[in-house]
Amino acid sequence: MLIIFLFFNFCYGFNEPLNVVSHLNHDWFLFGDSRSDCNHINNLKIKNYGYLDIHPSLCNNGKISSSAGDSIFKSYHFTRFYNYTGEGDQIIFYEGVNFSPHHRFKCFFNGSNDVWIFNKVRFYRALYSNMALFRYLTFVDILYNFSFSIKANICNSNILSLNNPIFISTNYSKDVYFTLSGCSLYLVPLCLFKSNFSQYYYNMDTGFAYGYSNFVSSDLDCTYISLKSGSYKIFSTGFVLSIPTKALCFNKSKQFVPVQVVDSRWNNLRASDTSLSDACQLPYCYFRNSSGNYVGKYDINHGDNGFTSILSGLLYNVSCISYYGSFLYDNFTSIWPRFSFGNCPTSAYIKLNCFYDPLPIILQGILLFLALLFIVFLLFLVYHG
């Protein structure tokens, strides 16, 4: 029995990395959209769990923050808002598709959606890298020393209306300050229109300035700055002040744990982008994707088998999570678990050549049988003189 076990273990491998998102224990959390929004099922004409890419048994575990039609990026910048909030040691993201080239958003008629896709990459890169160091995520409003009775109505379309940042004239008579308080770290937007000017956030406590210059953008070009609690003054060399109104709040620092990101894309009939894979980089992020087109069972954009398989890893714990995938066991494997965390395999074996062409084996058996018959015939002749 031991020989049979070793044969199959070495020849077939019982501990290959799985293309799933998973967790080491029950201390995990998922941020998503309609494909993991269990509450949205009740709004369908027929209550059909085939709409989801997650298993229905995950719906009531309190470890999912998802909203149909939303994304963290969309909620961050626009009036269409869902307060994504959650906490866990191992964080999984499966959202982002609800702001894509399919929506063709741009601030002006002659603006550029490409600029907004670049903004999306920068945003998620900052989100993923920060979330590898913190347990808790939510949205907060940014407080100011006065109310904005006069503001420019800029950057609206028939799809979305921008409200983070907003804009006021630099001729406004008062200095503009904002205060960040209560979170360990904030992700704040700093956005500029095409022009030869710059803008800064100046920390009144430390004297440190966070700046951004804009020379080439054909739309609203944004960078995303991680700020600590404090009082900040905004000043600009342009004609308008870009005023942030919302920030992502990171709290409860943790030991570094890479986030896991599942690609969020449409069926090929709609335009998607590669923002999430561009943003999800080592060492702070593992990216999981399906090899095929997204083809849903409920409709073409909901209930794909490939992504359902990737999300099925949330149903069980694994021993190790790495760049190559998740490992069920911590014994050994044929693929070394690079950039890993958890109880990971400590050795990689060489897979033996256990598969043969059956035809040569059959011929060898026939020849061996004939050789045995010949030997028996010779022994018979010798025995009988």
Curated annotation (Swiss-Prot):
The active site is at S34, D299, H302. Glycans are attached at N83, N110, N145, N171, N196, N251, N289, N331. Pfam families: Hema_esterase (PF03996), Hema_HEFG (PF02710). Isolate N5 belongs to genotype C. Genotype C probably arose from recombination between genotypes A and B. Structural protein that makes short spikes at the surface of the virus. Contains receptor binding and receptor-destroying activities. Mediates de-O-acetylation of N-acetyl-4-O-acetylneuraminic acid, which is probably the receptor determinant recognized by the virus on the surface of erythrocytes and susceptible cells. This receptor-destroying activity is important for virus release as it probably helps preventing self-aggregation and ensures the efficient spread of the progeny virus from cell to cell. Homodimer; disulfide-linked. Forms a complex with the M protein in the pre-Golgi. Associates then with S-M complex to form a ternary complex S-M-HE. This is Hemagglutinin-esterase. It comes from Human coronavirus HKU1 (isolate N5) (HCoV-HKU1).
